[in-house]
Amino acid sequence: MISFAEKLSFLMHITETSNKELAAELSVDPSMVSLMRTGKRRLSKKPIQVRKMALFFAKRSPAAFQRQALSEMLGQVSISPSMPTEVLASSLENWLQGKSDTIADTILSGIQALPDLPQPAPIRPTPAPASENQTLFFYGEEGRREVMSRMMQEMQQMETPGTILTVVDDNLEWLLSDYLLTKKIQSGFLELSERGFTVYQIMPTLNYINRYAESLQFWLPIYATGQIKVYYYPRLRGNLYRHSIIVVPGCCVQYTCAVATGSTSDITMFSTDPQLVSAFEKQFQEHIALCRPSLNAHQDPRDFLPCFLELFSRQGDTIQAVNSLSINSMPRELLEQLVRDAGTSDWAAGYKIHLEELPHFEERLRHAPYIDMCWLSSAAEVRSGTVPVVAFSKEYSGFLCYTPKTYCLHLKNILRLMEQYENYFFLPLDKKERPGYNLFVNEGDLALIVRTVEPFILLEIRQTAMITALQEHLLKKADAVGYDGIHREKVRMKLRSLIQELGG
């Protein structure tokens, strides 16, 4: 792992920056920069200082050779001369802070950043549609880019929304290395989703693709529209050749094949031949029949309930991190109150089902561990009447917030579960900054990520490797807090203290 001192020296070298110049930018003495370069001084904990440093180096790295060096050092193929300075500064900021670029981090940071993602208005294509019965061949990365642009033109010119069938079996380096084209294609897919196009995609598992995190950053905003259904082939396969397919039934097809070790051998076909398009469509249907669901997105909160019921009914280890006390640990009397207050709303049926499932949940605790990480509210927050019940915002819950009495009821039930079941672990999280998501993981089977600010989105993840990555992310957080032995008793003491402060 590269130290901060080594990172700083590298950046100062490729930008030909002196200690005095960087010190002037940061408003510190040059000796401070010297200490940081020798490892005797750590990176400032002040976010504004790190941001200023990252932006300073990004502005001084416009040349192609500098961007290439940064791309190799940071392991991000998307760092190219066309990448805006502000975007490069953000990547440098994360790198300097030592933030990892794991699959879990990519998904969780991406789901929070969705509204902030730049979505430039797509430029409407002007070229005429391709001639029918036309089959053309293109070569190398430039050929792939040209065909991708042609495919996007054909799809955007369709008057009626249709279906797009895709097999993505490569690492997208040919696309990600061109920042402007990447944003144009991403924007095009977002526009097609808004128009009502449905996309079916077959993706490889994590261990069959390089740059998976960067590829995921490209696709995640498109997944979040809910218009794309993602599948994966679960069996082992050869890894010599890579190929990708885009089929627009009744319109056109793109097919690319290359040796996996490089991109210089890429051969890409573009065709509007009806027979060829139909043949590739049939081949895709045969392929997807052998695949399993990988990821789905839901935007309507009413569609969330079936996913949660499936998660809570599964056996095996479960771990979750949520921004409120969880519904699983809620006492019966509070759930009954929720049912009454919900009346005939869409929430009533869900609360009734959870009420009926309480005995099954406790029976499950006899057989498998359940780690319940929740952000605790302070006594002052509870007394203010602004802490929603089983929700991440008042807008989402719509009708009920905790009182000191009901919050104490919930805390007392958590204590009861801890006393009665050794497999139930409650970890109070009290950091001031809560993430913009709730995360639930059942070992090896299902993971749910709920975006907790508008627009509300639920990602339903079923690919084993992705689930494992998210589970390891939560277990690392749980291990850092501590949840067994002496830590268990400390949690009890913390809960009793809060109950006493609330007058319970």
Tell me what each language-model feature is.
Residues 18-24:
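Short alpha-helical "recognition helix" segments of helix-turn-helix
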Residues 1-17:
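A short, Lys/Arg-rich alpha-helix, primarily the initiator
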Residues 12, 37, 57:
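DNA major-groove recognition helix of helix-turn-helix
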Residues 47-64:
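DNA major-groove recognition helix of helix-turn-helix/homeodomain DNA-binding modules
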Residues 27-44, 72:
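Recognition helix of helix-turn-helix/homeodomain-like DNA-binding domains
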Residues 129-501:
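Hydrophobic protein-protein interaction segments
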Residues 62-138, 149-153:
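Helix-turn-helix/homeodomain-like alpha-helical modules used for DNA recognition
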